[in-house]
UniProtKB/Swiss-Prot annotation:
Protein family membership: Belongs to the kiwellin family.
Single GO cellular component term: extracellular region
InterPro entries: Kiwellin-like, RlpA-like_sf
Keyword Nucleotide-binding: no
Lineage: superkingdom: Eukaryota
Main location: secreted
Location of this chain's protein in the cell: Secreted
Protein name in the entry: Putative ripening-related protein 5
Source lineage: Eukaryota, Viridiplantae, Streptophyta, Embryophyta, Tracheophyta
Signal peptide: 1-18
Pfam families the record matches: KWL1 (PF24300)
SUPFAM superfamilies from the UniProt entry: Barwin-like endoglucanases (SSF50685)
Keywords: Secreted, Signal
Length: 276
């Protein structure tokens, strides 16, 4: 479900901008962090801590490092990459690592862009060297790179913008969990593209999602697939080879997809998209 957020520019020790929702039912702070000023890098107009000021904390899952390498891949990301960091509650202890989210600006002509979740924006810790002496993130922040701002046609100097965001693709089955190649659902129907080795969960988690998109896969070798029958939680093993129409089988969640050989590849085609 899409939510309403604000976009905010942050320091390069984090990603350079953030998304912050302003939906109803705001969370109450779980505590307050005493402010402590320091050598705060101000190149991207960050919210630097002030001595004696109390900053709200929002404890969800345990907070991690808000600066340095990204939590998801232990790597740094350039300003030109379409990447974001989620505040602690949404980050959910790395559960959303690698997810692709579509961000739509209320300003900038309503442009949208798809970005990858690579890090956490710490809602608990801050005002120290590890966090560039910046205040903790709010409970509703999505920290975004300058490339996201540019793609949305927004002025980074404003510092905060209203946006909506949700899991990409919206209105389509969320294809996810590919450990070698990330399938791109935006490609034209009928176009082949490499999928690669699949991990959990590969094709979504609800019957409604499953009805939205049909995929046809071409398997170069026999593969064993364990899948669940609807809500019965009954596992069935299916050995298949050649062309495979995913919507032929009565399951809502692929529990596991095991390749007969570790590095065997398969190809998939989006063959139809139902109107919701």
């Amino acid at each position: 479900m899409a939510m309403i957020f604000l976009l905010a520019a942050l320091s390069t020790t984090h990603l350079a901008s953030s998304l912050r929702p302003v939906a109803a039912g705001a969370c109450r702070p779980s505590g307050y962090l005493p402010g402590k000023s320091g050598n705060c890098e101000k190149s991207n107009d960050p919210d630097c801590c002030e001595d004696g000021k109390a900053y709200p904390q929002y404890r969800f899952e345990k907070g991690k490092d808000g600066g340095g390498p990204s939590e998801c891949d232990n790597a740094y990301h350039s300003d030109g990459e379409l990447v974001v960091a989620l505040s602690t509650g949404w980050f959910a202890g790395t559960a959303r690592c690698g997810h692709r989210v579509r961000i739509t600006a209320s300003g900038g002509g309503g442009r949208s862009v798809v970005a990858k979740v690579v890090d956490e924006c710490d809602s608990v810790h801050g005002c120290d060297g590890e966090h560039n002496y910046e205040a903790p993130c709010g409970n509703n922040i999505v920290d975004a790179s300058p490339a996201v701002w540019d793609a949305l046609g927004l002025d980074k100097n404003v510092g905060m913008e209203h946006i909506t965001w949700g899991r990409e693709p919206q209105g389509k089955i969320p294809v996810q969990g590919f450990s070698m190649h990330q399938l791109n659902p935006s490609q034209s129907p009928g176009k082949r593209f490499l999928v690669g080795e699949i991990s959990l969960p590969p094709f979504g988690s609800s019957s409604r999602e499953w009805e939205m998109v049909s995929w046809k896969c071409f398997l170069p070798a026999f593969m064993s697939i364990n899948y669940l029958h609807g809500s019965s939680h009954l596992r069935t093993k299916l050995n298949i080879k050649g062309e495979w129409q995913l919507d032929r089988y009565p399951f809502t969640t692929l529990q596991q997809h095991i390749l007969s050989r570790k590095f065997v590849m398969l190809w998939c085609i989006q063959v139809k998209k139902n109107v919701l």
